[in-house]
């Protein structure tokens, strides 16, 4: 057939890739340029938050602190914003809300971080509130399902929102661009805030921003806690801890963020199709034993499936600063119906690995 002939011609004349494909397109490879980029991004985030705090006449910036990477970055940005405004860093109110999955490591790191940054700190143990909420809705607490997890996230958002009202402040969102792409957030839970400072920053870049802050840290204690946060597995900590250790690791569930950020970059920045992105990924991650073709395919398929299925969360995002050329704000660069289907993209992938579909 004509289609078959075209396929044969395209296959036999496929251009050999000779250029280097960067596996981390969001992160500059040169250390000096990377440090300059990190400082610029942190300033952009702080500028955006400072403007919103001024415009809203907010007395406080309220942030839920988990001891994890994203909330750490949001806190660092909030401290910069307050300093920029000439206000005391105690106007940043960090709230830690331990529950069933909180570990000693993340809890301790949250406290040390807040102490070193000289912000106001409070702890709200949400366990009793969650128990009461589960009783209200008839949730069996022995069933560790989506309700068990999302219930905790929504209680945390409730506590933050009302704390902001009580203190005349606004809630600073912590979720990043990679989480928005994958829909890795609880709808109307950590998905919601009053201003999301990390919404334009992909996870691979979040790590480098925090590492940059560690490199320029004013004290050894601050540097050490930032490095330990960087070394902590990414986790929402919504399932009960096992022997005091994190039981739920995000990248085991949704896939490696370095792959998803690579896919995200070429989907949004260039609009490339699945086959082309898969080929670029093979070139970028060649020689990485943990990423054979089957694994690259698996997580690319997972990316498309989640990206389409989770658009409804991105259709109602809080405001936040635009950081780079790739963004998912429904008020900026990204227009996508929540009912869009991934069928065509998944069908193209199926042609690459028919046995994997």
Per-segment meaning from a language model:
Residues 5-6, 10-67, 71-357:
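ATP/NTP-dependent adenylation/nucleotidyl-transfer catalytic domains that generate, transfer
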């Amino acid at each position: 057939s004509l289609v078959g002939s075209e396929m044969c011609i395209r296959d036999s004349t496929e251009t050999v890739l000779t250029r280097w494909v960067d596996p981390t397109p969001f992160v500059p490879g040169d250390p000096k340029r990377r440090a300059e980029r990190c400082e610029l991004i942190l300033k952009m985030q702080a500028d955006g938050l400072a403007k919103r705090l001024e415009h809203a006449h907010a007395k406080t910036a309220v942030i839920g602190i988990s001891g994890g990477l994203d909330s750490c970055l949001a806190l660092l940005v909030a401290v910069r914003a307050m300093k920029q405004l000439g206000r005391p860093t105690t106007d940043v109110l960090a709230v830690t809300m331990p529950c069933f999955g909180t570990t000693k490591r993340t809890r301790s790191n949250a406290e040390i971080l807040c102490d070193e940054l000289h912000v106001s700190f409070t702890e709200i143990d949400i366990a009793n509130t969650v128990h009461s909420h589960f009783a209200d809705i008839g949730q069996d607490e022995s069933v560790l399902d989506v309700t068990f997890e999302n219930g905790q996230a929504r209680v945390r958002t409730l506590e933050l929102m009302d704390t902001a009202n009580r203190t005349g402040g606004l809630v600073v969102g912590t979720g990043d661009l990679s989480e928005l792409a994958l829909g890795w957030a609880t709808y109307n839970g950590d998905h919601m805030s009053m201003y999301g400072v990390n919404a334009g920053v992909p996870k691979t870049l979040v790590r480098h921003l925090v590492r940059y802050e560690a490199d320029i840290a004013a004290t050894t204690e601050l540097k050490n806690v930032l490095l330990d946060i960087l070394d902590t597995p990414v986790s929402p900590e919504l399932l009960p801890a096992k022997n005091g250790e994190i039981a739920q690791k995000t990248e085991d569930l949704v896939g490696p963020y370095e792959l998803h950020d690579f896919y995200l970059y070429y989907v949004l920045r260039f609009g490339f199709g699945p086959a082309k992105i898969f080929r670029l990924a093979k070139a970028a991650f060649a020689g990485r034993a943990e990423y054979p073709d089957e694994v690259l395919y698996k997580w690319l398929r997972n990316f498309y499936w989640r990206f389409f299925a989770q658009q409804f969360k991105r259709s109602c995002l809080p405001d936040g600063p635009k950081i780079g050329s790739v963004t998912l704000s429904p008020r900026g660069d990204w227009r996508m119906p929540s009912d869009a289907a991934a069928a065509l993209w998944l069908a193209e992938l199926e042609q690459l690995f028919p046995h994997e579909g």
